[in-house]
From Swiss-Prot:
Cofactor(s) for this UniProt protein: a divalent metal cation
Annotated Gene Ontology cellular component terms: cytoplasm
Protein name from the UniProt record: dTTP/UTP pyrophosphatase
Swiss-Prot/TrEMBL site (Important for substrate specificity) positions: 13, 76, 160
UniProt keyword terms in alphabetical order: Cytoplasm, Hydrolase, Nucleotide metabolism
Record-linked Gene3D superfamilies: 3.90.950.10
Localization per record: Cytoplasm
Family per similarity comment: Belongs to the Maf family. YhdE subfamily.
PANTHER family: BIFUNCTIONAL DTTP/UTP PYROPHOSPHATASE/METHYLTRANSFERASE PROTEIN-RELATED, BIFUNCTIONAL DTTP_UTP PYROPHOSPHATASE_METHYLTRANSFERASE PROTEIN-RELATED
């Protein structure tokens, strides 16, 4: 019998993507510090946060479940000039981030970490998508900020929402930018 899949995330987008891909899973939200370890390179910083989520979820789940399970955790960051931008702290920060991205390339990196409860086996990997924003006007930026959409998203935009209109082109998986590269998840799950 295959172990149950547990999404350890508060992200409604990750839950939706897994559902739409046909996965059967439970959701257990976990909170961990998402402050990156600056001693690591950017890719490893993002992997480290996904692993911290798995480490926080495992003991919680083991105490409440008798069956074997695989915990799925992810972290997504928008990277500009080699540095993570994070989620905006406030409206002014959202403006700063969107102005920075306007007319330029950036990357979206998602780290996916899966851990099997009975063996402790972990598989993890990152996925990268390159994004090019068209030139944005101040009016467009403030109108978008007024929608509230950018406030809970890395890089201050959602490709699947109104923020998608700012993207001129992208190279890499679309769902990676939404927050969960489904093909990578399928590939990693096949290793169990």
């Amino acid at each position: 019998m295959k172990p149950a899949l547990i999404l350890a995330s508060e992200s409604p987008r990750r839950k939706q993507l897994l559902s739409e891909a046909g996965f059967s899973f439970d959701v257990v939200p976990v909170k961990v510090s998402e402050i990156p370890n600056k001693n690591l390179n950017v890719n490893d910083q993002i992997l480290d946060i996904a692993r911290r989520k798995a480490s926080a979820a495992l003991p919680l789940l083991k105490s409440s479940r008798q069956d074997a399970f695989i915990v799925l955790c992810a972290d997504t960051e928008v990277i500009f000039n080699g540095a993570p931008l994070g989620k905006p702290a406030d409206r002014q920060d959202a403006y700063r981030i969107l102005k920075l991205l306007s007319g330029k390339y950036h990357e979206v990196i998602t780290a996916v970490c899966l851990v099997e409860s009975s063996t402790g086996k972990e598989v993890s990997q990152t996925e990268t998508t390159k994004i090019y924003f068209r030139q944005l006007t101040d009016d467009e930026i403030w109108t978008y900020i007024d929608t509230g959409e950018p406030m809970d998203k890395a890089g201050a935009y959602g490709i699947q929402g109104q923020g998608g209109k700012f993207i001129e082109r992208f190279d890499g998986p679309f769902y990676n930018v939404v927050g969960l590269p489904i093909d990578l998840v399928k590939n990693l799950l096949s290793k169990f």
